[in-house]
Structure formats: C-alpha cells, structure tokens
Amino acid sequence: MSSGIKEYNELIKTIVNDMVEQKKNENRIIDESESESESESENNVYQDVIPESKTQTQDNRVSFTETKYTEMKTLDNGFLQKYDVKLYGSDKDNYDIINDFLQENQSEEAFYIIDLGEIVKSYNNWIRLMPDVKPFYAVKCNPNPVILEALSELGVNFDCASEKEIRNIIDITNDPSRIIFANPIKMSSKIRFARSNDVDILVFDSEYELFKIKLFHPNAKLILRLAVDDSHSICRFNCKFGSKLNEVEELLTIAKTLRLNIIGFSFHVGSGCLSPEPFYNALADCRQATDIAIKLGFDISIIDIGGGFPGVDKKIRFEDIANRVNDGIRDFFNEENSNKKIQFIAEPGRYFAQKTHTLVINVIGKKVVYDEERNEKINVYYLNEGTYGSFNCIQNDHYEPTLLPFNEQKETCFRSKIFGQSCDSIDVIANDILLPELAIGESLYVENFGSYTLSASSANFNGFTPTSKFKYIFKDQVQN
C-alpha cells in the first residue's frame, strides 16, 4: 500500500506540473486581441486545467454547532453531581482545600486537585475579551475526560491531532462537526478514519498531504497552515509545520487542480508566546493568503489563529493578546467579520487547563550530602512523582514548577535537590532549591500544573504509572 501511494503521489505531482505548464504556455501564445481581458487571463491561469469542482462553489460554508456563545456560562448542578464535585467558596484558599483532601486521603500516592471553576472563569473571560473568536480546545494539552466534558458543556469545540483524540471527543459530544483535525501531517489511515467518522475539517501544509487527502478524503474542507513568526515563543513550531507565504499560490493552485476544497488558513505563533505582536502580524499574512485564494476562486470561511495563549497572566497578559487579535481582525478582516462571512477560531490549550490543576506530592526518601566547595549541607529529597510523570514538562514544555511545602513555616531554608521516584539519575525535579527541612511523609504541592503534564508523561517507566487520582472541586462560582 505505501509503495502504491508513493507512486500515485509522484504521478499526480507530475500530471499537475505538466498541466499547469501547458496552460501557462497556451496563455502565452494567445493573441492579445483575442483575449477578453489580459488581467482576467492572468487571474485564471489554472481555471480550465480541470473543470471546476462543484464542491468549490457549493457546500463550502462551515456551520459549527451553535451555542449561546456571547452569554456568560457556568456548569449546572447535574454535571457537578455526576462527577462528585466538591464545592468551595471564595473564602477557601489552596491550603484549606489541600488539607481537606489530605485528611481524607492517607495514601502515599500523589493526587491532583482539579478546579472546574477555573475552566468556567477562563471561558467567560474569553468571550468577554475576544467574542469574535470561537475556541477549539487543544486536546493534546490535557485530555482529562472530565475537563473535556466540562468544556463541551460550555460550548467549546475541539482541536484534535490523532485518531484517539477524535474518538474521545466523538464519545463525549456525539458531534464530529465540532472537531478540527489540526495535525498538518497525518497517516493515510487516519485520513480515512476522519472521512468515515464525518470529521471533514482537515489542516495541511504541503502538496504531499493534498495528494493523500485527494485519495482518502476528497470532499474534505481544507485549511492551509501558514508558517509565521514564532520567535517570541518558548516552544517554536514553524521549523516543523506551516507553508511560507510565497508558497501559498502554488499550493492552492495544486488544490484547485485536484478539485479539493480550501476553506481557510491557520497559523500557530508558538506555545508560550510572550508578545501579542505575532498574532497581529500573522493575521496580516492571512489577509494576503485570503486574497490569493479569492483570486483563484476559493471561498474562504475560516481563519484559525492557533494557540499560544497564557494560562497564567505572569509574563504576558491574555488581555493584551486579545486586544491585538481584535485589532488584527478589525484592520484586515473588518468587512468579512461584520457580515459573518469568515468565522475566526483559535486552539487554546494551556489557557483553559493550566490553572485548573494542583498537584499534591510527598517526600518518600531523604538523605544529606555535603558541598565541600561551599562548606554547607544539601538536603536531597525523593518524591512520589518525577520527570517521567507530571514533571516531564520541565524538559518537554520548558516549564519551571514552583514546589511549595504544605506545612510552610517561617524557618531557616537550606539548599536542596529534588529527585523523582524512578531509578534514572536524570529524573531531577529541582537541582538547587531553597526549602525548609522536610521530613519523610511531608507534603508539597505545585499550583497551575494542568497543561502538558500528564498528557506528555511516560506510560510505565520503571513500572511507575502516571498520577491517576483526581479530586474535583468547583470554587469561586455562583451555581444555577
């Protein structure tokens, strides 16, 4: 099968190139007096290569499942009861809540406290600051099924990158129209899977992906991912994904020749973006790409502004990014936004997930070593979590977690080193940290730990499985 696909791809590419060149040559020898319009001829070089596909002019609009999107929302009591969610008022801080669960849980196992109220607050903040952009939650960030269902209840749609993620969302929503298959590179079998499950919105960034889509999902609604400036981001993606602006016309021409349906453009400024300007500049690129698409006869109905939104307003505020996105929509797509010709969507992950999780861990081992150069002791602690579990984010997401002792006292702090529970010497959570003296069995906690932690952890290294105990709460919200 793979050999046949390769041969077919090469054949299609050869045919496309030959037909395009042939059409260009024909246009060159046409006498100007016989041409109705020179500019019209230039704009339609590829129009007659293959007869116009009906799908390019019909059934091109994307209608996502309607929700009361501009209305502030919360989760109803039925949902909270379904998952035995414990309610807390705003007078309770993390210490009080952790203490409640420690009293109930005498196990040595690590556990997460997940505040679903943070999801509601984030959602309402989004629609207040960026009402013209519909969020499609990036499932890869945290695929916890309760979080996914909570987001679905609020009307959030979903960005999926794999068959498993698609299956999970269909199981929860029973509505494949709420999914964008946003991975630009997909196995042929996964494209077939998307087609058989009515997942029609696919992202691509190369002609080879177009060839696969032509074979296995020819009626898909396609979004071309652009490579944009991601130099202000902690995790940069455009070295791997995205087509440059000067490649757009060629790719769209191939799509038109193959009778594929282009409906929009997407971009990703990188995860952990520290400046709002890349969003604005990328929207300017989308404007140029949209103009090229219109010239070729495509009806553009989606602009996907990707992810990169902060979960915690620490190094940059979400509001600053939202304001700049709104500026870009106004400056480059004001008419299309006003008449709802184009739907703007985004792929937030950590924005929704990061603040929801607090990880509670404890000390399972300890020893004291001496730094002869500095003539001082170093306390070495071993915890019941590590970099093969939730703390993988230290390497994979460039995250620097803050470990807080639960029994915090105003006492002398000592240089400390913290290891995870595996047998690997690189399982280091903190190399040099100041902590008070801790005893075996004492608890620590990490706040804002819900993004790219469990989702990227190793499944079973050394036989240690990822943390699987979750305590759900709902804090600081008025219930229906």
Give the positions of each predicted feature.
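Charged (often Lys/Glu-rich) extended helix/loop segments that serve as interaction or gating elements
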Residues: 97, 101-103, 324, 330, ...
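Active-site-proximal loop/turn and secondary-structure-junction residues that shape catalytic pockets
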Residues: 118, 141-143, 164-165, 185-187, ...
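A charged N-terminal "starter" segment
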Residues: 2-202, 207-220, 255-257, 261, ...
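Conserved, mostly hydrophobic/aromatic
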Residues: 119, 140, 162, 194, ...
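Electropositive phosphate-/nucleotide-binding environments in soluble metabolic enzymes
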Residues: 113-120, 145, 160-163, 188, ...
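Non-catalytic surface loops within mature trypsin-like serine protease
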Residues: 226-228, 474
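Structural preference for beta-strand elements that scaffold enzyme active sites
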Residues: 134-136, 157, 178-180, 201, ...
